[in-house]
Amino acid sequence: MIKIADNSKENIYSSNMELIDNFTEYSSKNLDFDKPVEIDFLDNEDNAKNPLGTTAHYNPDEMKITIYVTGRHLKDILRSISHELIHHVQNCRGDFNGMEDTGLGYAQKDKHMRGMEQEAYTSGNIMNFRDFEDNYKKENKQMKTSLKELKKIINEETQ
């Protein structure tokens, strides 16, 4: 359901494939969308220099998420993906129908769009990403503990 296109010079996807795939699989299972979406990783040096530059955006007509990766921490990139995936969920529900203005200030001018942004922040950044992060850390901690126990057993058996 999620296709990734890595058009970044840093090959952000290739160098972080396991974590990104884990996150997108988790999101696919936990978010309510029924249409495929594409995530495109792009570089933009000028945007990266702007302290209030664009980090990501969703194109509802193309069902495509663009993530700007230049100079960003992977955790921040994953948060952006999560936020934009909520916009994809909204699009699949039909919440974008009739929307025309997504220019500067749209979230302050349009009550419906403000609600959509609020949902994207709370459901995307707080719930989906945070739940993924906590579950991922818990599973990896359990795996490390199991490996330590296994090594201990092996050492005891070989002595």
List each model region and its residues.
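Short pre-active-site segment immediately N-terminal to the catalytic Zn-binding motif
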Residues: 64-81
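Auxiliary, metal-adjacent structural segments of Zn-dependent hydrolase domains
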Residues: 6-61
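Substrate-binding/catalytic groove segments of enzymes
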Residues: 89-100, 128-136
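Post-HEXXH active-site segment of zinc metalloproteases
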Residues: 75-79, 91-122
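Short, contiguous pre-domain boundary segments
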Residues: 2-8, 101-105
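Long, well-structured alpha-helical subdomains associated
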Residues: 111-113, 117, 122-159
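Short, solvent-exposed loop/turn segments at secondary-structure junctions
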Residues: 44-47, 71-73, 128
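Short active-site segment of divalent metal-dependent hydrolases/proteases
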Residues: 82-90
